[in-house]
Amino acid sequence: MASEGMILTNHDHQIRVGVLTVSDSCFRNLAEDRSGINLKDLVQDPSLLGGTISAYKIVPDEIEEIKETLIDWCDEKELNLILTTGGTGFAPRDVTPEATKEVIEREAPGMALAMLMGSLNVTPLGMLSRPVCGIRGKTLIINLPGSKKGSQECFQFILPALPHAIDLLRDAIVKVKEVHDELEDLPSPPPPLSPPPTTSPHKQTEDKGVQCEEEEEEKKDSGVASTEDSSSSHITAAAIAAKIPDSIISRGVQVLPRDTASLSTTPSESPRAQATSRLSTASCPTPKVQSRCSSKENILRASHSAVDITKVARRHRMSPFPLTSMDKAFITVLEMTPVLGTEIINYRDGMGRVLAQDVYAKDNLPPFPASVKDGYAVRAADGPGDRFIIGESQAGEQPTQTVMPGQVMRVTTGAPIPCGADAVVQVEDTELIRESDDGTEELEVRILVQARPGQDIRPIGHDIKRGECVLAKGTHTGPSEVGLLATVGVTEVEVNKFPVVAVMSTGNELLNPEDDVLPGKIRDSNRSTLLATIQAHGYPTINLGIVGDNPDDLLNALNERISRADVIITSGGVSMGGKYYLKQVLDIDLHAQIHFGRVFMKPGLPTTFATLDIDGVRKIIFALPGQSVSAVVTCNLFVVPALRKMQGILDPRPTIIKARLSCDVKLDPRPEYHRCILTWHHQEPHPWAQSTGNQMSSRLMSMRSANGLLMLPPKTEQYVELHKGEVVDVMVIGRL
């Protein structure tokens, strides 16, 4: 700990943090401490606080235990910051604020107020939180809610002030002076000419979405969802919430609604806020896009699109979306895709799911010494020789007799070993000496070999020991894992939810598959292909049908299902056609963030990816090309990995193998994903990749029987084609 007045060096400036989880259920191992673990990640994130976790503990909801830990961490460990999570509500055992008040020497009410203000703009239930913030010695103590989402939100609300607060407590003279000097250079805001008009809560709700969009338009060059008002230079809840980094989203943390306008009547991103925050938008790994705010109420209320379809002559002649590399597009999709929450399911429904909790064995397996073979339970010390048979031990029965010297007992595979026996001799190493007159019973047997103690016996707990972790969190379950759940008697298990995927085709020219072909019309194959692709991976789907090329129809179709689906896939309406309005509906009507609208690839150039945050829940939107092959190829390249991440699969990337070309292949200026059929020849290490023929993006026949995509590089002056026998990368998309 730095002494009074000491100038801190860079090494001394490391923030030492303790995370204290207050929860009866977590303390008793009845629940996982998600909030505490998440806070540790947030604290250590260099783009956030960049601190060091010096202490972590789980205590029950007991005042004395909470106090004892806080005092120890303040006085003995001399931590700079303590974050508690849990016990701040109205329940009888929620006593964290009371314990904290008995420990702190000075209160920090501004921080508690910032958390309450921010929470109330997320949910009215925020008023039920009772956080206490205060100081003991040179340690700052912050009470956060017990939920993972609530604790993360409140941590982010106070984050901009934390580094400066800790510098003040540590008397870090140089750093404190730097911030104060920057604040002194700021102009004071002029007095208001008139008091701001008061509005009813109802009116504020109605105007929220419009206000946010207008402010976003005024700050187009900003990488964050905040606004800058020249007449205001104070830190607001809006400025704080606007700095939530997208790097958190890439870890699968539930997204917060970036409705920054609703957090303050005069939101600002002032130099003071920048000076007191360690969050930098430059560190954000996502494309610089405008952040939009939406609520379910505002979206569902809209039935008429705001897209202007009258000025056809003024439509874009060139796409306004820059070309995005395939690598960047793929990384963006995974970074913007959240991991879904969890649910409890019956183990019989566990195929293909990802475990959200470790699974432990409740019993030993086997629970008794068991025979490995059919034979005779013997005393190893007796050695070879003739033995009397005293009975039989069968699987499912517990023998009551004890094997004495000169005796053996007949056993079957899996049967319990009787008392007195310490080895099993297989039936092949014996000879029958005597039997009953009717031949129904063995009476005496000759042991032909010397048995070893423990021979052919599975001891108690040999396969699985009681308390052993048999399946780890994050395990992607298959038939064997389902069998293990049954083995250890775990009939209910917590898993990550499956994403629900809604699929829609767009186009005035489309007919349903059962319809007769009419002039100017074609049957819709994209929807069937995409639904089948998603269902083949086990995900639940919603069929949204065909929607015409009309903004109102597109908006209403999306509104109808957007609350029921986690992912929406559309095909068509994303290139340069005069009737293609989908991107405009996403942008203007739904206020979605379009992260990319063109990808440098073949097929699939106009592939579009967008996200929409509604009331704190992120919706993923893939607007795929209308050409049938382009739609299914981009679905495999982008959609399937995103769905795998959403369900919690640790590595959602597709499987890529090496294969030899069966024929010469000409290269395209764009990276190409060429459909092929993989086959193995006898004793060859690599499969052979046979092209499916004409690769025109409208020719669905090129997908027939295809189980791979040749990942061909773009053409260069040196390389215009690849030759038969060359080894290339192939992405596996079907059964091998």
Swiss-Prot record:
Its GO CC terms?
cytoplasm; cytoskeleton; cytosol; dendrite; postsynaptic density; postsynaptic membrane; postsynaptic specialization; synaptic membrane
Enumerate the subcellular locations listed in this protein's record, separating them with semicolons.
Postsynaptic cell membrane; Cell membrane; Cytoplasm, Cytosol; Cytoplasm, Cytoskeleton
Output the InterPro entries linked to this UniProt entry: MoaB/Mog-like_dom_sf (IPR036425), MoaB/Mog_dom (IPR001453), MoCF_biosynth_CS (IPR008284), MoeA-like (IPR038987), MoeA_C_domain_IV (IPR005111), MoeA_C_domain_IV_sf (IPR036688), MoeA_linker/N (IPR005110), MoeA_linker/N_sf (IPR036135)
What cofactor is needed?
Mg(2+)
Compositional bias segments (type: Polar residues): 261-290
Name the membrane topology term.
Answer: Lipid-anchor
Sequence segments annotated as region (MPT Mo-transferase): 14-153
The record's SMART domains line, in alphabetical order, gives: MoCF_biosynth (SM00852)
Reactions listed under catalytic activity: molybdopterin + ATP + H(+) = adenylyl-molybdopterin + diphosphate; adenylyl-molybdopterin + molybdate = Mo-molybdopterin + AMP + H(+)
GO terms under biological process? establishment of synaptic specificity at neuromuscular junction; gamma-aminobutyric acid receptor clustering; glycine receptor clustering; Mo-molybdopterin cofactor biosynthetic process
Q: What is its EC number?
A: 2.7.7.75, 2.10.1.1
Pathway field of the UniProt record reads: Cofactor biosynthesis; molybdopterin biosynthesis
Tell me the GO molecular function terms. Answer: ATP binding; identical protein binding; metal ion binding; molybdopterin adenylyltransferase activity; molybdopterin molybdotransferase activity
Instruction: Region MPT adenylyltransferase: list its residue ranges.
Output: 294-736
> What keywords are annotated for this sequence in UniProt?
ATP-binding, Cell membrane, Cell projection, Cytoplasm, Cytoskeleton, Lipoprotein, Magnesium, Membrane, Metal-binding, Molybdenum, Molybdenum cofactor biosynthesis, Multifunctional enzyme, Nucleotide-binding, Postsynaptic cell membrane, Synapse, Transferase
Disordered: region residues:
181-232, 260-290
Mark out the compositionally biased spans (Pro residues).
187-199
- Could you tell me which NCBIfam families the record lists for this protein? Glp_gephyrin (NF045515), molyb_syn (TIGR00177)
State the family named in the UniProt similarity comment for this chain: In the N-terminal section; belongs to the MoaB/Mog family.
How does this chain assemble? Homotrimer, homodimer and homooligomer. Interacts with glycine receptors.
General function of this protein: Microtubule-associated protein involved in membrane protein-cytoskeleton interactions. It is thought to anchor the inhibitory glycine receptor (GLYR) to subsynaptic microtubules. Acts as a major instructive molecule at inhibitory synapses, where it also clusters GABA type A receptors.
Q: Under what name is this protein listed?
A: Gephyrin
Q: Which organism is it from?
A: Gallus gallus
What gene, per UniProt, encodes this protein? GPHN
